[in-house]
Regions:
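Membrane-embedded alpha-helical bundles of multi-pass transporters/translocases
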Residues: 1-535
Length: 535
C-alpha cells in the first residue's frame, strides 16, 4: 500500500468531516452565540469526550492496536485468523461492559461531576441556573461514551486491516446530527440548547451503526454478549476474556497508557476549571479557537497517527528496525512540510478566518477579537501537537507505554505552572490557557524525540539532509508569510464587509498563499514522488 495515498484518503475524509464541523460551528455560533448556555453545553460535552479518549482513542487504542497488529501478522503466516477473531470478541465484550458500568455511574453522579469540572459555574452570574443546565445537558451527552468508544475500537480493527476510509468518514455523522438538530429541532425545545445535547446522543448511535457493514466485510464484527438475564453465563464469558493471554497483555499495557492519557486529559480539565472563573464566553472562545486549530491537526496529525501505528506495529512484529526508523523519518518530514505553513497561516489569517466563519448572529465583534487571541496561542503549538502524533506511535507500536507516560506527567506539571504564570500572574486570561498548552506541547515533542534517539528507535537519519530540508522549508515559509501579510490588510477591511464577501476574499488569499508556498518548494527541488512510500 502507498502510504501517501492512504494519507490522502484519510485526510480527504477528514477534510469532509472538518468542513461539516465548521458548518456545525457556524450554525451553533449563529443560533446560540457565545454565553451561559453554550458554556454549559461545552462543559457538558467535556467529560464524555474525556472518557472517550481515556477508554477508546487514548489508552485502549494504544494498547489494543499494537497487540491486534501482532496477532494479525502471526495469523496471516498461519493463514488462519481464528485466534485474532477470538481476541477481538473477548476484548470487545470486556470493553462494552466496562462502558455500560461507567455510563451508569456517570449519569447518576452528574451533579458531582459538573461541580468538580466547572466549580466556577456556581459562583458565576446566574450561577445556579448555569449549574443546573450543565447537569441536565450532561445526563444526555454522557451515554455518548458507550457508542463512540465501541466506534473507536471498530476503527482500530479496520485501520489494522488498512481499511482507513470508514473510520475517517465516521465523524461526519456527528456533525450532520449537530447541524440537523440545530436547524430543525432547536426551535421546538423550551430551551433550544437541549437540541445540541440530543444531537450528541443520536450522532453516537449513527456512528456505531456505520461500522457494522465494514466489520462484517472483513469477518471481524465483534461478538458481544449483552444477555442481562443470564448473569452466570455472562460471568463465565467475562472470566474467560480476562484470562485470555492477549487480553491480559492489552490490560497490562492499558494501565500505564491510562495514566498517560489521564494526565493529558486532566490538563484539559484543569484548564476548564481556570476558564470557569474567567469572564463569560471564555470557554466558548477557547472552543472556537480550538476548532480552527484542530482543522489542520486532524487533517495531518490524526491522519498520520492513523496510518503510522498499524504499519509500525507490523514492522515491529517482523523485526524490521531500519524500515521502522525510515517510516518515522518520513512522518516527521511530512509534519514539518505541512504543519508549519498551517500554523503560520492560522496566525496570520486568524481574524479573517474567525470573522468569516463565526461573525454573524449572536457572535459579536468582541468575541471575534477574543477568539483571535486564543487562536494565536494555539497556532504557536500546532506543529508540536502534530509531531506528538508521529513520535508517540514510535513507542506504542513497540508496546512501550511507560516512556510517553513519564513525559506526559512532566508535561502536566509544566502546563499547570505555566497556567499560574500566564493566567494568574501575567493576566493573559483565556489566551494564557491556550499558550500554556502550546508551550507544553513543544516540551512534550522534544522529550519524545530525544527518547526515540536514545533508545535507538529513530536512528538512521542524516543530519546534513535535515538541515538542507529545513533551510528550504524556511525559505518557502518566509515567502508565503510575506504574501499573506500583504494581502490580508487591516482588521476593519474584514469586519466591515458581508460574510459572503469575506469568504470570497479569504478563499483567494488562501489560494495565493498555498501557490506561493508550493511553487517555492518546487523551485527549491521538492517533488511529490520523493514522499511516496510503500508498506
Amino acid at each position: 500500500m502507498n502510504l501517501l495515498k492512504a494519507l490522502s484518503i484519510v485526510s480527504g475524509m477528514t477534510l469532509l468531516s472538518r468542513i461539516l464541523g465548521f458548518v456545525r460551528d457556524l450554525v451553533i455560533a449563529r443560533i446560540f452565540g457565545s454565553g451561559m448556555q453554550t458554556d454549559a453545553f461545552f462543559v457538558a460535552l467535556t467529560v464524555p469526550n474525556l472518557l472517550r479518549r481515556l477508554f477508546a482513542e487514548g489508552a485502549f487504542s494504544q494498547a489494543f492496536v499494537p497487540i491486534l497488529g501482532e496477532y494479525k501478522t502471526k495469523s496471516e503466516v498461519k493463514n488462519d485468523l481464528s485466534e485474532t477473531k477470538i481476541l477481538v470478541d473477548r476484548t470487545a465484550t470486556l470493553l462494552a461492559w466496562a462502558l455500560i458500568l461507567v455510563t451508569l455511574i456517570g449519569v447518576i453522579a452528574t451533579p458531582l461531576v459538573v461541580f468538580l469540572t466547572a466549580p466556577g459555574f456556581l459562583s458565576a452570574e446566574n450561577g445556579s441556573q448555569k449549574y443546573e443546565l450543565t447537569v441536565n445537558l450532561m445526563k444526555i451527552t454522557f451515554p455518548y461514551i458507550f457508542f463512540i468508544s465501541l466506534v473507536a475500537m471498530a476503527g482500530g480493527i479496520l485501520n489494522t486491516w488498512k481499511k482507513f476510509a470508514i473510520p475517517a468518514v465516521t465523524p461526519t455523522l456527528l456533525n450532520i446530527s449537530f447541524i440537523s438538530m440545530s436547524l430543525l429541532a432547536a426551535p421546538y425545545f423550551d430551551e433550544p440548547i437541549y437540541a445540541l445535547a440530543w444531537a450528541v446522543f443520536i450522532g453516537g448511535v449513527l456512528q456505531l451503526a456505520l461500522q457494522i457493514p465494514a466489520l462484517l466485510k472483513i469477518s471481524m464484527l465483534p461478538s458481544i454478549n449483552f444477555n442481562f438475564f443470564n448473569p452466570m453465563n455472562l460471568y463465565k464469558l467475562l472470566k474467560i476474556a480476562v484470562q485470555d493471554e492477549g487480553v491480559k497483555r492489552i490490560l497490562w499495557l492499558m494501565f500505564p497508557a491510562l495514566l498517560g492519557v489521564s494526565v493529558s486529559q486532566i490538563s484539559l480539565i484543569l484548564n476548564n476549571i481556570f476558564a470557569s472563573y474567567l469572564q463569560n464566553g471564555s470557554v466558548s472562545w477557547l472552543y472556537f479557537a480550538d476548532r480552527l486549530m484542530e482543522f489542520p491537526a486532524g487533517l495531518l496529525g490524526a491522519a498520520l497517527g492513523t496510518i503510522l501505528l498499524p504499519s509500525l506495529s507490523e514492522y515491529n512484529a517482523k523485526g524490521w528496525k531500519e524500515k521502522y526508523s525510515e517510516l518515522l523519518d518520513w512522518g516527521l518530514k511530512l509534519t514539518f512540510l505541512l504543519a508549519t505553513p498551517a500554523a503560520l497561516g492560522l496566525a496570520i489569517l486568524a481574524l479573517p478566518l474567525i470573522s468569516t466563519l463565526f461573525f454573524t448572529g449572536e457572535f459579536s465583534q468582541h468575541s471575534v477579537y477574543q477568539t483571535r487571541l486564543a487562536l494565536w496561542a494555539y497556532a504557536s503549538g500546532l506543529p508540536a501537537l502534530i509531531l506528538i502524533k508521529v513520535l508517540a506511535p514510535g513507542f506504542y507500536a513497540k508496546q512501550n507505554i511507560k516512556t510517553p507516560v513519564k513525559i506526559a506527567i512532566l508535561t502536566l506539571c509544566i502546563t499547570q505552572i505555566l497556567n499560574v504564570i500566564l493566567v494568574l500572574l501575567l493576566n493573559f486570561q483565556h489566551m494564557g490557557l491556550a499558550l500554556s498548552i502550546s508551550l507544553a506541547a513543544w516540551i512534550n515533542a522534544g522529550f519524545l524525540f530525544f527518547k526515540l534517539n536514545q533508545h535507538k528507535v529513530y536512528f538512521n537519519y542524516s543530519v546534513a539532509e535535515w538541515i538542507k530540508f529545513l533551510l528550504k522549508l524556511l525559505t518557502a515559509l518566509a515567502l508565503m508569510s510575506a504574501s499573506l501579510f500583504l494581502l490580508v490588510g487591516s482588521d476593519e477591511s474584514w469586519l466591515q464587509i458581508t460574510q459572503i464577501q469575506r469568504a470570497i476574499k479569504l478563499f483567494g488569499v488562501i489560494i495565493v498563499g498555498i501557490l506561493v508556498y508550493f511553487a517555492t518548494l518546487f523551485v527549491l527541488g521538492f517533488r511529490l514522488k520523493d514522499f511516496k512510500r510503500h508498506v
